[in-house]
């Protein structure tokens, strides 16, 4: 066991994490040159394209060190994005060490800070690595200082390498073997294995990626999940090198996979503990929690006959993504669709993109909303995620909105614009510290202000230099109201929003004027109104098209003209009583793009 090293790589997007992983795999001969391709561990197309890692992957490698011993290195690749922070914390819990990869030209960024703190909390040894030293803009001295100022890790002995050219990768491995402690665990104790990740395979069912903490696991053993209490028969165990290789057993300290004929992903929850059914461990490994969706949106097929196909596509996605939740809902304006829950904005985008790409779906997405907590007059507390389900105002004592803590990291020049943006979004500044040339701002901010367009606006005011990460803090009471849009006196449920009272009149006006441009003219006047409860706060009218009934009159008597105009008016009035208005798709999309200029 003293020759095993379990480690993961922490880095911000684009700092060269996957490339470094490729080089390490190549150096240890995990794959032949023929099978080697760029970003071996990112298996989904969308992961490659966006250059992000979504699912955790592993590679068990053998490395012959300079001291002549052969070490077993288990590389656990972690997602780098804040939406997947729970997956990151589980990946890190399975390691004893982590390589903190920092781009020698860009310096430290927010997400690597966040994941690094997670690592330090878990008691993981952090080894700083400066990547991309072959770039002309690289400034290793400054970046080392930044690592010490921002993260507080001693970086004087940071290894320098260039994953692209392969320079210094061997030094990274040597330093790692020297600094990262071997795993502790007892092969004699009852089995305890932590599920790092799980995914679905069409042939064998769910494949669980585990780190064995104590005990030994062999095929034909009966295993039990500690969170769900379900038991299964273990069919196969093995390791990934990144290709799967079956093994006779997995013992304490090792990282590998278990196949046990499990049908659904929800039975193998990330962070759960696997133990033997006939000799169970006394308690589970710490840190398991159910992941709760933070952001909700309605997904509707453009063609209503695609509803079943959408359900199937969502179910297939759920096989590989246990954190995706959905339930059918119907809207009088958009027909049948699903209300889906996501971990965050990136997660939502990825799910949408995969539906459109892998399953050829045409989707309409309603504006993303968050979960609100309501305290009712009856004293009960309920949570709603759909604005159109909000009960009557008379039954509600208070509405509480989710508040997040958001950490922003940016160069000094952009502090002003970023602070203005945060204040506009009702943020409260909690902290501000200068570290070298970077500034770190901490704000408490309502999540519903962030979900619409905060990220895009942040990038534009800081010219792309600011990076952010956020975590949920608490539900807090706020003065929120439900804004309804009415067309011709009828409420359109898909357009309801929950907004802050101070912002409501402004949002109402903006929406209504946008709607007026988008609803095609009919034969009668259409009133588009925004209301809060029974109060109309804004109104626009889509004017009717009318025929010139006086065209045949040349000159003639004024009373004759009056009669014709009155008759036309009567007709329009009758039409208005029976007419109904089709709202085009563009109108819904426009609502999503109401920019608070």
From Swiss-Prot:
One Gene Ontology molecular-function label: ribosome binding
All copies of domain tr-type G, residue ranges: 2-184
Biological-process GO terms, alphabetical: positive regulation of translation
Record keywords: Cell inner membrane, Cell membrane, GTP-binding, Hydrolase, Membrane, Nucleotide-binding, Protein biosynthesis
Enzyme Commission number: 3.6.5.n1
Pfam hit, one: EFG_C
Primary localisation category: membrane
Cellular localization per UniProt: Cell inner membrane
Top EC group: hydrolase
GO cellular component terms given for this protein: plasma membrane
Catalytic reaction annotation: GTP + H2O = GDP + phosphate + H(+)
Signal sequence bounds: none
Annotated GTP binding sites: 14-19, 131-134
SMART domains noted in UniProt: EFG_C
Membrane-topology descriptor: Peripheral membrane protein
Function summary: Required for accurate and efficient protein synthesis under certain stress conditions. May act as a fidelity factor of the translation reaction, by catalyzing a one-codon backward translocation of tRNAs on improperly translocated ribosomes. Back-translocation proceeds from a post-translocation (POST) complex to a pre-translocation (PRE) complex, thus giving elongation factor G a second chance to translocate the tRNAs correctly. Binds to ribosomes in a GTP-dependent manner.
Family: Belongs to the TRAFAC class translation factor GTPase superfamily. Classic translation factor GTPase family. LepA subfamily.
Full protein name: Elongation factor 4
Species this protein is from: Methylobacillus flagellatus (strain ATCC 51484 / DSM 6875 / VKM B-1610 / KT)
Organism ancestry: Bacteria, Pseudomonadati, Pseudomonadota, Betaproteobacteria, Nitrosomonadales
Name of the gene: lepA1
């Amino acid at each position: 066991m003293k020759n095993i090293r379990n480690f993961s790589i922490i880095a911000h997007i684009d700092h060269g994490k996957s490339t470094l992983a490729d080089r390490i795999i190549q150096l240890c001969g995990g794959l032949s040159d023929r099978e080697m391709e760029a970003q071996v561990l990112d298996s989904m197309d969308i992961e490659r394209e966006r250059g992000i890692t979504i699912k955790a992957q592993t590679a068990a490698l053998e490395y012959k060190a300079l001291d002549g011993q052969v070490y077993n290195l288990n590389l656990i690749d972690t997602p780098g994005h804040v939406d997947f922070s729970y997956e990151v914390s589980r990946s890190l819990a399975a390691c004893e060490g982590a390589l903190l990869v920092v781009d020698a030209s860009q310096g430290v960024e927010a997400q690597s800070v966040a994941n690094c703190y997670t690592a330090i909390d878990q008691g993981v040894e952090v080894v700083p690595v400066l990547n991309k030293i072959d770039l002309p803009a690289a400034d290793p001295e400054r970046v080392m200082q930044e690592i010490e100022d921002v993260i507080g890790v001693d970086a004087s002995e940071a290894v320098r390498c260039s994953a692209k050219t392969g320079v210094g990768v061997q030094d990274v491995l040597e330093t790692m073997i020297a600094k990262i402690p071997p795993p502790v665990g007892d092969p004699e104790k009852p089995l305890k294995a932590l599920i790092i990740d799980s995914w679905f395979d069409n042939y064998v069912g769910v494949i669980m990626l585990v780190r064995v903490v104590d005990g030994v696991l062999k095929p034909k053993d009966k295993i039990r999940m500690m969170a769900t209490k379900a038991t299964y028969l273990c069919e196969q165990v093995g390791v990934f090198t990144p290709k799967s290789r079956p093994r006779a057993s997995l013992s304490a300290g090792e990282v590998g996979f278990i196949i046990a004929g499990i049908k659904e992903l929800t039975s193998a929850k990330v962070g759960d503990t696997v133990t033997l059914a006939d000799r169970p461990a006394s308690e589970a490994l710490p840190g398991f929690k159910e992941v709760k969706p933070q952001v909700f949106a309605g997904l509707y097929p453009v063609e209503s006959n695609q509803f079943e196909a959408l359900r199937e596509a969502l179910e297939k996605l759920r096989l590989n993504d246990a954190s995706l939740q959905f339930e059918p809902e119907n809207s009088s304006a958009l027909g049948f669709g699903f209300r889906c829950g996501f971990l965050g904005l990136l997660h939502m985008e990825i799910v949408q993109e995969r539906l459109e790409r892998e399953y050829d779906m045409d989707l309409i997405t309603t504006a993303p909303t968050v979960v609100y907590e309501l305290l009712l007059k009856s004293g009960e507390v309920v949570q709603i995620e759909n604005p159109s389900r909000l009960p009557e105002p008379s039954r509600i004592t208070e509405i509480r909105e989710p508040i997040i803590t958001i950490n922003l990291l940016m160069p000094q020049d952009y502090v002003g614009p970023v602070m203005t943006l945060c204040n506009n979004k009702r943020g409260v500044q909690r902290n501000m510290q200068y570290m070298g040339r970077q500034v770190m701002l901490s704000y408490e901010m309502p999540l519903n202000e962030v979900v619409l367009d905060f990220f895009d606006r942040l990038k534009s005011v800081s010219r792309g230099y600011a990076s952010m990460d956020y975590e949920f803090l608490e539900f807090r009471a706020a003065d929120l109201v439900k804004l309804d849009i009415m067309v011709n006196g009828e409420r359109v449920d898909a357009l309801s929003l929950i907004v802050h009272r101070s912002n409501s009149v402004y949002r109402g006006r903006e929406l209504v004027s946008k709607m007026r441009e988008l609803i095609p003219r009919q034969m009668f006047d259409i009133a588009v109104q925004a209301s809060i409860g029974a109060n109309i706060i804004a109104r626009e009218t889509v004017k009717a098209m009318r025929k010139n009934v006086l065209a045949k009159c040349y000159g003639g008597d004024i009373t004759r003209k009056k009669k014709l105009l009155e008759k036309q008016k009567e007709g329009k009035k009758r039409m208005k009583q029976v007419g109904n208005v089709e709202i085009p798709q563009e109108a819904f999309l426009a609502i999503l793009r109401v920019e608070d200029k």
